[in-house]
Amino acid sequence: MENKEGIPRHVGIVMDGNGRWAKERGLPRIMGHHAGVRTVEEIGIAARDLGVSHLSLYAFSTENWKRPKGEVMGLMGLFRYYVRGKISAMNRDNMRMRFAGRLVDLPEDVQDILHEAEEQTGNNTGMDLIFCINYGGRQEILDGINRALASGKTEFASEDDLRPYLYLPDVPDPDLLIRTGGELRMSNFWLWSGAYSEYYFSDKYWPDFDAQELKKAIESYARRERRYGTA
């Protein structure tokens, strides 16, 4: 589903390339993640101004726990700092902050900060800024099935029967999925809801991805004809 003038309603981004960006500059990997935060700010504003109603960012996957312990701890610290500091700006800009993933597996204080951000921005009516943290597309499907079974559901007549049990069932399917960093895969991102998404791959590392590149991705999307399997 689209907004006016071919603007995708929901854009999802795999924010890849922070580590390589840092390595090429002789910096620790965590500095690449810090640089990536600045890009989050720019792209969030740009997406809102373009008319995107939902922007989802793949911030930490279920596989990212396998990274060096220091990097994982640094990322958790970055989540604490960024989310807590972002609440007032989100309220000022009338935007909601939301989270998708197995949040229960995160450190308890991080969970508390995420819940606080959702509560304090929950009444805003502008763009949804969604961070996928400890997220995996396969895990989302498995968790959804287990939640459905726990609620007493024993069969699914259609795919719509599973949607209420996914992480964010009210969020529209992503129209456009973008990956930065030059890799040509989506790495377990929105496997269920992204079944009919259009893809756009950028060679730019995430810290170098900017509003102009986002506009290029959306312009590419607007030129495509989405047929959903029809002729």
Predicted feature locations:
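Flexible, compositionally biased loop and terminal segments
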Residues: 1-231
